[in-house]
């Protein structure tokens, strides 16, 4: 009986309970709420609506829902009560007039269709607006709310109605029964009815317009949450085969390999099978349950920032391309999980072909992964099929995700971007007909990365182990306490706006048939990629682990007393809070002591106790691994660290000379760490940092000179140590250039790495990235761009020696002697 009674109740609700004030609806709501409280477990988006949406609970609030559903209304009520928002079932009393606190825009399909409340919603809007005409102090906040049970987009064929159509009572019952725990209540930013009344008037036509705009809002919101319908896979393949680009590539394949047209076409289909996703809503739901269970046991929290800007872009109809940094294989799952719980469609994800092994490959494919080879070179058919598939995803309106770094960072820093997929994204725009494409840079951070031990081995020369089921199981078996996770959405980059500003005539290159490569494409793609990396770093997340690792690795003994560590963390926190790296970066709100307690729970550090107090130690075997976490936020602290290094060395220095020194070294730092400031912004940033360092007592300012404060010299020295290894690396390369101005770039990179490895052994430098090939390659390219190396390949000895002398002052004498003697074959 308990099964059929709610069903009967759902059907009854459509037959005439329209008056809120009558006694029957009150009884009815109580009866209906009982099964709903058991069947429905919804979540609110955003997580805390009032502060995140700027709702003022001291002013009247009314709710607008897309269609008449008492189940939706009661689900909304539960979330409102949970978040201290007004009860939608309690009427609003305004100037002696009682009005319902909720409005249904549409009646929705019903078992019996004689009742059409459309006019009632318009009348209620008109009543609310009319009250604003008579009361100039009144300002009702109208909050649009969507309640969704399940989010299956449906298929393009074989379904007459989409699963998320407006449901009658019986249909709604089954939706709640099966999907009650896959539901969410989406609160939208409020609309001021006072502003509406003042700007547009209060007559009935305005009320009608308000209802019409609300209907459009809900339609867009549903599309943002559910996405477009999914094609039958074979239909998608047939459409791709029929495209002119693939048809031509098939002909070229048959001719170049001297095979039949049918065989060439089979090759194309095989590539589609290799590449294409096989998206399944059922797999998304199942994985969401598993991940929800897993995250709750492995992570102490997933911190998400700036998701509202992404939801708004999806609502406005943008084609979203998520471009996260790549730390771990966990990124794929974490980002899709976060997006799903933010009320957004999980994207189609470009995954490396190395992940296409059983059983991970089929699972990832059903979660939206499409697979990409490491290189397209020498395979025109493959590149054409992949490009056309990506373009088809865009044209159909699916969100897409790819890692612009091309692979996981082994050092914790951002890698130089790989631009192939980004180039294809812009080429898709040049086909015309797509919605506006917006790139969303995303910073993903962890307090524990499960692959970090493997990364350290690979950086020291070990062969990368091929991904496989046994390797995956070994990794999963090691998962324990992973601490906190961080997903920060950076500043979006609308591609159309970018191209309009930087390539005003880009539309002249549009070709709906062929993929084009205009002359401006490559430099523009390179600039966009570099800008994306800067925006990813702008959204960096400081946390307990990376802050503690930064401080302990700065100590030559990798150990500090608890008091010293607390003081150092306070230094970092105050710098980041009072001179924020960017408006998108995040800093913990917890105190330094609380962060240390949390970091100690991660079991990465040792604590020795004596009669004086605690000493916190980073064990030698952990030191190499912990550089990964330090490097996650190196960009956020490198400028104050460089300033501290210069002041520490000189004891006192004028602002102008400090600025000159920073100006010389900044281009290398900017290129290596994707720093956000241009050179002309540096004076203001350095002034702000100097003032903050003075406020902390690290330095004193006298007659426009910065002086070291002896009473806080340890904190300043630990801050300066954050730039120590970077300056040593630069010194190696500039010394080699000065000693041999005609050295070619390849040899310069190789010899720089050799000296760095020697330095690492002799001076106990634990950072694997210290002699990473990619780091020196990037540095040498920057030296060419900055004019230290001419187009002919020769260095400018006077300039390089001047920079080396500056660097030599900032490194210790024993390190300097090792560098200078290494080129002479001495030890």
Curated annotation (Swiss-Prot):
Record key words, sorted: Acyltransferase, Cell inner membrane, Cell membrane, Lipid biosynthesis, Lipid metabolism, Membrane, Phospholipid biosynthesis, Phospholipid metabolism, Transferase
Motif HXXXXD motif, residue numbers: 325-330
GO molecular function (one): glycerol-3-phosphate O-acyltransferase activity
Subcellular location: Cell inner membrane
Protein's pathway: Phospholipid metabolism; CDP-diacylglycerol biosynthesis; CDP-diacylglycerol from sn-glycerol 3-phosphate: step 1/3
Family note: Belongs to the GPAT/DAPAT family.
Name of the protein in its database record: Glycerol-3-phosphate acyltransferase
């Amino acid at each position: 009986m308990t099964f059929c009674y709610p069903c009967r109740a759902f059907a009854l609700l459509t037959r005439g309970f329209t008056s809120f004030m009558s006694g029957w609806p009150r009884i009815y709501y109580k009866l209906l709420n009982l099964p709903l409280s058991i069947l429905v477990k919804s979540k609110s988006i955003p997580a805390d609506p009032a502060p995140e949406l700027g709702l003022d609970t001291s002013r009247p609030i009314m709710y607008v829902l897309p269609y008449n559903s008492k189940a939706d209304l009661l689900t909304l009520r539960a979330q409102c009560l949970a978040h201290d928002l007004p009860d939608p079932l309690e009427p609003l009393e305004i100037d002696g007039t009682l009005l319902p606190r909720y409005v249904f825009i549409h009646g929705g399909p019903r078992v019996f269709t004689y009742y059409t409340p459309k006019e009632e919603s318009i009348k209620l809007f008109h009543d609310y607006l009319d009250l604003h005409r008579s009361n100039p102090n009144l300002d009702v906040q109208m909050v649009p709310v969507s309640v969704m049970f399940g989010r299956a987009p449906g298929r393009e064929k074989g379904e007459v109605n989409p699963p998320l159509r407006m449901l009658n009572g019986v249909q709604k019952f089954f939706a709640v029964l099966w999907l009650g725990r896959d539901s969410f209540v989406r609160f939208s930013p409020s609309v001021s009815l006072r502003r509406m009344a003042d700007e547009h008037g209060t007559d009935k036509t305005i009320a009608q317009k308000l209802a019409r705009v609300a209907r459009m809002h809900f339609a867009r919101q549903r599309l943002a949450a559910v996405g477009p319908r999914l094609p039958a896979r074979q239909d998608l393949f047939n459409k791709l085969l029929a495209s002119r680009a693939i048809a031509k590539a098939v002909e070229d394949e048959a001719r170049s390999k001297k095979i039949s047209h049918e065989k060439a076409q089979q090759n194309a289909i095989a590539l589609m099978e290799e590449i294409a996703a096989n998206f399944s809503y059922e797999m998304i739901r199942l994985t969401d349950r598993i991940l929800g269970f897993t995250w709750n046991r492995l992570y102490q929290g997933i911190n998400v920032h700036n998701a509202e800007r992404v939801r708004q872009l999806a609502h406005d109809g943008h084609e979203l391309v998520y471009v996260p940094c790549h730390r771990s294989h966990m990124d794929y799952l974490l980002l899709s999980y976060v997006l799903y719980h933010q009320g957004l469609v999980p994207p189609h994800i470009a995954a490396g072909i190395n992940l296409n092994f059983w059983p991970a490959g089929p699972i990832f494919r059903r979660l939206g992964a499409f697979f990409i080879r490491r290189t397209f070179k020498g395979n025109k058919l493959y590149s054409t099929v992949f490009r056309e598939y990506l373009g088809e995803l865009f044209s159909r309106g699916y969100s897409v995700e790819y890692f612009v770094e091309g692979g996981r960072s082994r050092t914790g820093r951002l890698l130089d971007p790989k631009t192939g997929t980004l180039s294809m994204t812009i080429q898709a725009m040049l086909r015309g007909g797509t919605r506006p494409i917006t790139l969303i840079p995303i910073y993903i951070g962890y307090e524990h990365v499960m692959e970090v031990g493997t990364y350290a081995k690979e950086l020291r020369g070990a062969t990368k182990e091929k991904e496989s089921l046994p390797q995956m199981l070994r990794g999963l078996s090691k998962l324990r306490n992973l601490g906190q996770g961080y997903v920060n959405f950076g500043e979006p980059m609308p591609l159309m706006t970018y191209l309009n500003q930087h390539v005003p005539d880009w539309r002249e290159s549009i070709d709906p048939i062929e993929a084009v490569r205009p002359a401006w494409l490559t430099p523009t793609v390179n600039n966009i990629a570099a800008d994306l990396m800067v925006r990813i770093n702008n959204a960096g997340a400081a946390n307990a682990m990376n802050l503690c690792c930064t401080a302990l690795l700065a100590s030559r003994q990798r150990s500090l007393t608890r008091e010293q560590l607390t003081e150092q963390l306070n230094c970092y926190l105050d710098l980041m809070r009072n001179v924020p790296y960017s408006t998108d970066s995040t800093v913990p709100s917890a105190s330094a002591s609380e962060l240390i307690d949390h970091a100690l729970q991660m079991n990465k550090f040792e604590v020795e106790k004596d009669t004086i107090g605690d000493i916190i130690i980073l064990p030698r075997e952990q030191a190499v691994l912990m550089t990964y976490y330090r490097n996650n936020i190196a960009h956020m602290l490198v400028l104050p660290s460089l300033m501290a290094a210069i002041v520490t060395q000189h004891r006192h220095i004028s602002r102008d000379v400090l600025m000159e020194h920073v100006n010389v070294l900044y281009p290398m730092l900017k290129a290596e760490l994707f720093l956000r400031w241009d050179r002309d912004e540096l004076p203001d940033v350095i002034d702000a940092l100097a003032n903050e360092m003075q406020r902390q007592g690290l330095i004193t300012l006298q007659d426009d000179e910065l002086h070291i404060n002896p009473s806080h010299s340890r904190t300043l020295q630990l801050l300066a140590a954050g730039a120590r290894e970077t300056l040593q690396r630069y010194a190696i390369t500039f010394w080699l250039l000065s000693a041999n101005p005609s050295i070619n770039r390849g040899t310069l990179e190789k010899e720089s790495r050799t000296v760095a490895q020697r330095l690492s052994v002799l001076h106990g430098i634990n950072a694997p990235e210290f002699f990473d090939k990619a780091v020196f390659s990037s540095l040498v390219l920057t030296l060419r761009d900055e004019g230290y190396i001419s187009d002919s390949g020769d260095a400018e000895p006077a300039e390089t020696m001047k920079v080396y002398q500056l660097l030599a002052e900032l490194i210790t004498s024993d390190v300097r002697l090792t560098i200078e003697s290494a080129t002479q074959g001495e030890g």
